[in-house]
């Protein structure tokens, strides 16, 4: 794996409406992409609590809520409301219609 590499993961047209996620892969890493309030966010697609896919959750007030266990994960920094555990977040760039994530 090439750390700090930018990888194209999706097109803007593939994103769901605000608050819903999609699952993508970047160099073998599962990533949940969310569009929220005009920005694209990328979070590792694993809930820090029980390991369920965050891409199946919904976003409310800047946090993805895991659809399996109800944990809240901040899209900006990966912090969790209930514990000190964190989800990994990835920098995102939108280049034209393409979404790129730095891993």
Which residues does each PLM region occupy?
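Flexible, gly/pro- and Lys/Arg-enriched active-site loops
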Residues: 80-86
């Amino acid at each position: 794996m090439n750390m700090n590499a930018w990888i194209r993961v999706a097109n803007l047209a593939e994103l769901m409406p605000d608050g819903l996620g999609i699952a993508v892969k970047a160099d073998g890493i599962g990533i949940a992409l969310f569009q929220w309030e005009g920005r694209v966010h990328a979070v590792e697609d694993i809930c820090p609590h029980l390991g369920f896919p965050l891409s199946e959750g919904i976003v409310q007030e800047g946090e993805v809520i895991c659809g399996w266990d109800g944990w809240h994960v901040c899209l900006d920094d990966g912090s969790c409301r209930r514990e000190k555990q964190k989800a990994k977040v990835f920098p995102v760039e939108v280049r034209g219609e393409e979404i790129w994530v730095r891993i």
